[in-house]
Swiss-Prot record:
Sample GO molecular function, one term: DNA binding
Biased composition (Basic residues): 9-21
Protein name: Probable transcriptional regulatory protein CTL0717
Chain spans, region Disordered: 1-21
Organism from which the protein derives: Chlamydia trachomatis serovar L2 (strain ATCC VR-902B / DSM 19102 / 434/Bu)
Keywords, in A-Z order: Cytoplasm, DNA-binding, Transcription, Transcription regulation
GO BP, sorted A to Z: regulation of DNA-templated transcription
């Protein structure tokens, strides 16, 4: 899939699987807290909360963790989480998009500035990088659950646009953002397991880098990924 590069495929395939899963779990818990803050703690009357609780269970987040965070979310001391997006240029004209979910935007902004100070690159105005990317829906299908050829047939039948097989653990079924819910439902109806569904950024064009530039960009990207509030980092490095 566009957005995965030779640098990502050699370096990021060696990423800590536990770290990646931890980020997914953390994001889901933040979404749960946000849903409670917006619509109340009762899943019977809060459709978004009901959906996120099911999502957490699908990700094998323990029930005690879910219950503990439901209580935490109901506390007046617990701040709500906000989604924030940062745009950067790395080395060699590579564009980087950072998505974070935070209860303290000042802290997250400070962490972003530290990343740039330590690893280079530049934070830029909103829209400066986004035009190089397209917003897509993505359903995450565990690779152990189905072979690529079979899934590709289902993707076409279910209204998906493309299939990304670059990730070590998941196939990504790509579609238009507005079609994400219907594509997921169609996949589930065919017996396909969808561990998660969400919106992602896919680059419209890739930027070639030499080895030194690629390593510098990876160092910046890895620093950004390790910021606690950061959920996803996208880039257009070839």
């Amino acid at each position: 899939m566009a957005g995965h590069s030779k640098w990502a495929n050699t370096k990021h395939r060696k990423e800590r699987a536990d770290h990646k899963k931890g980020k997914i779990f953390s994001r889901t818990i933040k979404e749960l807290i946000s849903a409670v803050k917006m619509g109340g703690p009762d899943p019977k009357s809060n459709a978004r909360l009901r959906m996120i609780i099911q999502k957490a269970k699908d990700q094998n987040i323990p029930n005690e963790n879910i219950e503990r965070n439901l209580k935490k979310a109901s506390s007046a001391d617990q701040k709500n989480y906000e989604e924030v997006t940062y745009e950067l240029y790395g080395f060699g004209g590579v564009g980087i998009i950072v998505e974070a979910m935070t209860d303290n935007k000042n802290r997250t902004a400070s962490d972003m500035r530290v990343a740039v100070n330590k690893r280079g690159g530049a934070l830029v105005e909103p829209g400066s990088v986004l035009y190089n990317f397209s917003r897509k829906g993505a359903c995450y299908v565990p690779k152990h659950s189905i072979d690529e050829a079979s899934l590709l047939t289902h993707v076409i039948d279910c209204g998906g646009e493309d299939l990304d097989s670059d990730d070590e653990e998941f196939f990504l079924v790509l579609c238009e953002p507005t079609d994400l819910a219907s594509v997921k439902e169609a996949l589930l109806a065919k017996g396909v397991t969808c561990s998660e569904e969400r919106l992602i950024y896919v680059p419209l064009r890739l930027v070639d880098c030499d080895e030194e530039t690629g390593k510098s960009n990876l160092a910046l990207i890895e620093w950004l990924e390790n910021i606690d509030d950061v959920d996803d980092v996208y880039h257009n490095m070839a």
